From Swiss-Prot:
Entry keyword set: FAD, Flavoprotein, Glycoprotein, Oxidoreductase, Secreted, Signal
Annotated organism of origin: Oryza sativa subsp. japonica (Rice)
Domain of life: Eukaryota
A Gene Ontology biological process term: cytokinin metabolic process
Organism lineage: Eukaryota, Viridiplantae, Streptophyta, Embryophyta, Tracheophyta
Family (UniProt): Belongs to the oxygen-dependent FAD-linked oxidoreductase family.
Tissue specificity comment: Expressed in inflorescence meristems.
Modified positions (Pros-8alpha-FAD histidine) in chain numbering: 104
The protein, known as: Cytokinin dehydrogenase 4
Amino acid sequence: MRGAMKPSIVHCLKLLMLLALGGVTMHVPDEDDVVASLGALRLDGHFSFDDAHAAARDFGNRCSLLPAAVLHPGSVSDVAATVRRVFQLGRSSPLTVAARGHGHSLLGQSQAAGGIVVKMESLAAAAARAVRVHGGASPHVDAPGGELWINVLHETLKHGLAPRSWTDYLHLTVGGTLSNAGVSGQAFRHGPQVSNVNQLEIVTGRGEVVTCSHEVNSDLFYAALGGLGQFGIITRARIALEPAPKMVRWIRVLYSDFETFTEDQEKLIASEKTFDYIEGFVIINRTGILNNWRTSFKPQDPVQASQFQSDGRVLYCLELTMNFNHDEADIMEQEVGALLSRLRYISSTLFYTDVTYLEFLDRVHTSELKLRAQGLWEVPHPWLNLLIPRSTVHKFAKEVFGKILKDSNNGPILLYPVNRTKWDNRTSVVIPDEEIFYLVGFLSSAPSSSGHGSVEHAMNLNNKIVDFCEKNGVGMKQYLAPYTTQKQWKAHFGARWETFERRKHTYDPLAILAPGQRIFPKASLPMSL
C-alpha cells in the first residue's frame, strides 16, 4: 500500500509546506503544555493522549493528522469547557478543535493536527443524553449529536415512528450528517435531513452552549445546518418524525437509454402519487447483473430475465420502494403496478422483493459486513459527489459515461434527481440554481497500490470529471467537497461566501472549529492561505 499512501501524505502536508515556503513560523504546542492546560479542566468525561492514531483516521483513509489529545466528553459542558479554554488561549495558540462522529469523513475533515478531537459518540453514550421520542400532533425525536442514525431509528420504531429523510448508510452520527446535508432517495419529497430539523443545541467557537431553531437564534440554526462544523459543534438535534411503515416493496429495473432513464425519474419525483424512495445508478460494463440480483430479489418474468445480457454495456438502474403495512399489501400491489405501467424500462429486468422497513434502511450495513469480511472496507475511498443541474446532466453523462468512464469503475455510481424547493436556502448547503438537479456520486474504492484499483487511478478519473465540468459550464457544485484552499471555497460558495464568512466571524472568530475542512485557517495564521 506504500504507493497508494504517498500522494495522500503530500496532500495532508500541503498546508504545512505552504507555511514553510512563505516564511511563516508555526509554533507547535509542547504536549506537556497541552496536557497541563487541559488537565486543569473539571470534566464529567476525560481526555486521553494514547489513542491519537485512531482519531487521525477516517473512512476516506487518505489522510492522517495526529491530534494532541482526544476528549471523551461525559456532558455537553465538557465540550463547552474545552472549546472555551482554547478560545481563552487567544490568537497566539495554534490549538484547534474537531468534532469526530463515526469517522466517515473522506479527507481528514474530522481531524485536528496537533489539536483536540472530540469523540462525539462518547457524549451519546452518557445516560443523560439518551434519545427521547415525543409523539402527538408534531412527533419528533431529541437525539444527541454523537448518536448513530441506526440507533435513532431503533428507538423511534419502538413508538411506531421514524425520521422522514435519511442517508443511504445509517451508521453515521446525527451531528455529522446535519453538518453536511444528509441525502438519500427520500430527498425528492422531504428534502435532505437538514430540511427536517426543528431545533439544535450547539457549542459555538466561543465555548457557549446555545439552543437555536427556526424562531430562536435562527441565524446560528441555519448556519450550522450544512455548515461543515464551522460555526459550532452540534450536541443535540430535534428531528421531525412520521408514522413508520412495517414493510417495503423494493424494486429494481434497468434502462439502456439515459434520456428515457432521466425522464422517467423526473416524472416520478414530480408526481404527487409516487414511490417513497427513488434513486438511480449507473452500471458500466458489468456481467451477470440480473444473476447477482437473484440472491436478494425475484424476477417478474424469470424466463425473460434469464435471456438478458449486460456485458460491455452502460446501463441505468432505477431503484424504487413503496412503504406498506401488512393489511395494505393488496392496495400496494395495485399502486405499484399503476406506477410501473407509466415507465419505459427494459421489461425483462423488473426485479422486486419485500423486506422490513428496518432491513431496507440498513441495507448498506449488510454490504459493509461482507466487505469487512473480505478486508475491503478499510481501504482508501476517493469519492466524488456532485450536484448537477438538470439542464446540463445530459451533456455531463455523454462525456463522463461515454468517454471518461466507458471501460470500468471501482464502486457504485449514484445518479438521481431532487427538487430544489425541498431544500431550505437559508442553510449553509450550496446547491445549483435550478428547480431540479441531480446528485451524482462516484463511490470508488481503491484496494490496490497500483493499476485500476489504485488511489492514483481513481483520482485521475475524478480530476478529469471535475475538469470537464469546470471548462464546459456544467454548473456543478461539489457535495462533501475536498477543497484545500480558501480560494476554492470562495468559488464554491459564490455570492453566499459573504454570509458564510460573516457567520464564521460571529460564532467562531478565532477559527478554532473543524480545521480539517480547510476553509478558515486558525486566526493566528495568514488568511491568504
